[in-house]
């Protein structure tokens, strides 16, 4: 029976490389997958899943007006798995569509993303994935300043920590840093 998986981690925890690895493993066995990513993430181009170690692949961009369930249901070849990158940016409806893909089409869905933003608030997509997922796993990484587990994301601008502002600002290593709780409140910047 298919399940909805939510795999979350901070920046630099290897979420995207995990997606690319899972896709490769399925496809090596001749089992097609669908890779999707938020249309908001355009760092490396529209509809591109890209890891920090240089691996990249085309993906179906997800906007708030796409009906993910209908899109998957109408594919000529049923996928063995649907893989979602940047799932924190999904809308509530997007997440409910993913649950329908699992429940009605019997296709496993693995959603990868951040859990909380730089203000330690849940993203909309994360909130609903935490509510609906059958299995929830943390992808761990370490704090940039010590060897404790990173559980938070620190936003920086011009080398200074930022605790206020818009929730969504697409960036990379130069803007967001994985940190533990101690270094979130007292970064060594």
Curated annotation (Swiss-Prot):
One of its GO terms (biological process) is DNA biosynthetic process. The active site is at 86 (proton acceptor). Keywords: ATP-binding, Cytoplasm, DNA synthesis, Kinase, Metal-binding, Nucleotide-binding, Transferase, Zinc. It comes from the Bacteria. It catalyses: thymidine + ATP = dTMP + ADP + H(+). GO terms for molecular function: ATP binding; thymidine kinase activity; zinc ion binding. One of its GO terms (cellular component) is cytosol. Its EC number is 2.7.1.21. Its main location: cytoplasm. It is an enzyme of class 2 (transferase). ATP binds at residues 9-16, 85-88. It is found in: Cytoplasm. Zn(2+) binds at residues 143, 146, 180, 183. Homotetramer. Belongs to the thymidine kinase family. This is Thymidine kinase. It comes from Streptococcus pyogenes serotype M6 (strain ATCC BAA-946 / MGAS10394).
């Amino acid at each position: 029976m298919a399940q909805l998986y939510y795999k979350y981690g901070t920046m630099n925890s290897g979420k995207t490389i995990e997606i690319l690895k899972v896709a490769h493993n399925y496809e090596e066995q001749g089992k097609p997958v669908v890779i999707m990513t938020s249309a908001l993430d355009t760092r490396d181009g529209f509809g591109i899943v890209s890891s920090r170690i240089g691996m990249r692949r085309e993906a179906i961009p997800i906007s708030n007006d796409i009906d993910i369930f209908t899109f998957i249901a109408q594919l000529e070849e049923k996928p063995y798995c649907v893989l979602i990158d940047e799932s924190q940016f999904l809308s509530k409806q997007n997440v409910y569509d993913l649950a329908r893909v699992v429940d009605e089409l019997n296709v496993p869905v693995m959603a990868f993303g951040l859990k909380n933003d730089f203000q330690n608030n849940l993203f909309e997509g994360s909130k609903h994935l935490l509510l609906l997922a059958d299995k929830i796993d943390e992808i761990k990484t370490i704090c940039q300043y010590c060897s404790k587990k990173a559980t938070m994301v620190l936003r920086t601008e011009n080398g200074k920590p930022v605790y206020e502002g818009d929730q969504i600002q697409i960036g990379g290593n130069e803007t967001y840093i994985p940190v533990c709780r101690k270094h979130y409140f007292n970064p060594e910047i």
